[in-house]
Amino acid sequence: MKKFVSKVLAGALGLSMLCGVAAAEGETYVSWYTFGDVYLSSVRTALDAAMEAKGLTVVDKDSNANQQTQTDDINTALVTGANAVVVNLVESGAIGTAETLMNAIKEKDVPAVFFNRAVSTDNAEAAELFKGYEKSAFIGTDFTQAGIMQGKMVGQYVLDHYDELDLNKDGKISYVMFKGDEANQEAIARTKYGVECADEVLTAAGKPALEFYDASNANKYLVDLNGTWSNTASFDYMQTILAQYNEANGNMVELVICNNDDMALGAINALSNAGYNLAGGEGCTVIPVFGVDATEAAKELIANKQMTGSIKQDAEGMADAVATITANLIEGKDKFEGLNENYEVVDGWTVNIPYSVYTGE
């Protein structure tokens, strides 16, 4: 079994290197928003293996966060004979772009499987798109749940450790929120509910709501201006914050909430450089840092007591659902045949992969 898995993974890695090649006749084309996203990298590894296990030959292509590149590459793949097109849309929420791609794929009468990045901010609009082509499906999450679960986790942790987190003893907990992308549906929901649900837990227990560290910031978040949810953005922001907001000045940021684990990593690196959140958590002040995805890097940080918690976005589950549905559509089966019963099929066109809390315990 181990030898088989090793062969599958080796094959998958080889296939994933075909990122500059258009799909040939009978190959399954997977178009990625970017190869630079940590979570999507884990999905890609799992998806290549899952597709290979189903007998599909995969061509992965990096769109480098450029929608025109993605559109052009998909059109080329269709011309060269791809047997299915799997799309991780660059322009999340752009229904016009999704319609253009769907129409091109539909014209070739091959399966169109979109995943992870929403095609519209309007669920009814998305439903109409996918119901308009029987060989299509969307695999994602109930995007509000990550923020809700994160917010509840944050709120309970703060409540349980209130006095030790209140570094300046003003009776309130100051926080910073790092947002991955200004327009992305999931980023918007995580930013909203990550704080609102924490506040619900705190106020229900008679504690004040969280207070954004910078009263002049009306948005109450700092966003990656490149929309790439990157650790570079959060690192730079956190370094700048610590120069002015620190224990010496009596206004230290006491809580860090991030839209994803990569941004949590950047914040922790900046905190560590300033003497906080050191490996092991001994002999230093540890500022609670929360993320989403439960990446391997985040799990290691949590084990090292440098990070507090994350919400697991199941990369293997996402890959399994995409591979199962794609193979079913290629073979002319019911698209949801053999799908893991833990996945939620909604309205005949979309599948939600569940989230879970991860604290390392």
Task: Annotate each predicted stretch with a short phrase.
Residues 18-26:
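Sec-dependent signal peptide cleavage junction
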Residues 70, 136-170, 189, 231-238, ...:
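Hydrophobic alpha-helical segments within soluble ligand-binding/sensing domains
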Residues 26, 169-174, 178-182, 186, ...:
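Hinge/cleft segment of the Venus flytrap/periplasmic-binding protein
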Residues 101-145, 164-172, 295-303, 307:
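Flexible loop/hinge segments that line or gate small-molecule binding clefts
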Residues 27-46, 50-51, 58-76, 80-82, ...:
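Extracytoplasmic "Venus flytrap"
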Residues 84, 90-112, 194, 216-299:
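Hydrophobic alpha-helical
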Residues 64-126, 138-141, 261-264:
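Beta-alpha junction/loop-to-helix N-cap segments that form part of ligand/metal-binding clefts
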Residues 39-54, 146-150, 185-212, 233, ...:
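Short, solvent-exposed amphipathic alpha-helices that sit
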